[in-house]
Amino acid sequence: MGKPQTHQHAVDTNVSHSPARWVDGEISEGQLPDKRLDRRLRQVFDQMGGAMGQSIPRACKDWANTKAAYRFFSNDRVSDHAILKGHFVATRERVTSASGPILILQDTTEFSYQRERPEQIGYTKSVNSGKDDTGRWRHHTVCGLLMHSSLAVTISGVPLGLTALKLWTRDKFKGTAALKRKINPTRVPIETKESYRWLENLRQSNELIADPGRCVHSDIYELFSLAAELGTNFLVRAQNNRLACGGTHTVTTELADQPVCAAQVIEVRHDKGAVMPVTLDVKFRTIHVLPPIGKQKTYKPLMLSYIHAVERDEPTDRPRVDWKLVTNLPVHTAAEAIEKLSWYALRWKIEVFHKILKSGCRAEDVKLRTADRLTKLLAVFCILCWRVFWITMSSRDGTAAAEVDLTGIEIKILDRVVPDKPSCPADARNLAFYAIKLAKLGGYLNRKSDPPPGNIVMWRGLNRLTDIALGISIAAELVGN
């Protein structure tokens, strides 16, 4: 096979990949029960990753590959956990290589689907659909899946990967609203609640990372107690005004007596998209917190640090910023309180991850008919979306090498297709450098006034890079023949 030599950035089609494909770093050998399934999983990643947001038939391009993908997702020997197993291992390696505290962000999201037979998938909620002729509210159930995910990020906001993932549906709605009015939810055993998944993900994340002291998790008292048992840390936004001291006070009354110790300026985005700075008055206090009354025989009181940050001036066009955070980390100074506020501000990263799933992969547009098949496809989407998010954030961090996520042929393609600036130093060719080139393929202009590239231009660039690589591969075969 001939090698073009006419340009300093000519693409060498014989360059070996390092790794062979990016996905090889996210798939463990033998993680599926059959080598053929391992090969098919890699092929599914290549196909879906090269056509993010497209349907399975369009990504697979022909009936044979489409049918093979359908069979893979229908295979009883394949599970969503098996698909994610290699990614969990890779996440652990990235966490080990990173320095400083690791934030484990947890959140739940919904995926809704329109199906002729919704019972094959399940339901997420019951909603009002207007009134009938007699004026009574009509209810209908929404077909879909729920996903609770845990994402490891550095304190600079770089996503290192998923540490735990749970997918499920709901099957009981009738009478639940009336039941909530009759019982005290704090007296119900946590094991019977959906919120138990927060504890399950906390435990799985700590087992995976194997260094719980570095982890900070994102207002369940059982989570507080489990964190103490596992020797890990948490930082959450408090939702409940818990009993404090001997039960004669609450957390709110304890904080009310504290003076403001610092001011912190943050940026707030309006509904219309405009960003403006606001000043928060910050105070903190370490408080002896009691468990809920119905669970005081099961759980012990805890010494927790509360941080209250409230917007100094009452706005007229939006709700006032009012954060009340609770953590088992020590908070003795104003600087430590502000540090925890900056950590909590990173919580939106997991919301961005879920947005990539729905907007980039268009996870709610897929046509698979059963929950079992959908969960496996969503597991694939999660890894693809993490990669987009990882490259996007790496474009703002100049420490990672390009070979960490891009293959040799991909690097050469970017060098050939996206010209360098004359002043570009040779030693600056890291992942951040090539991420900008990748974003340019997706339409990013890289002007001085432009913000850093976002996820949309990044996945467009990845799709285009895949098409260019395919064209080069076909051209090389034609020349060779």
What are these regions (language model features)?
Residues 2-132, 141-146, 151-481:
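Single, function-defining residue in the core of a domain
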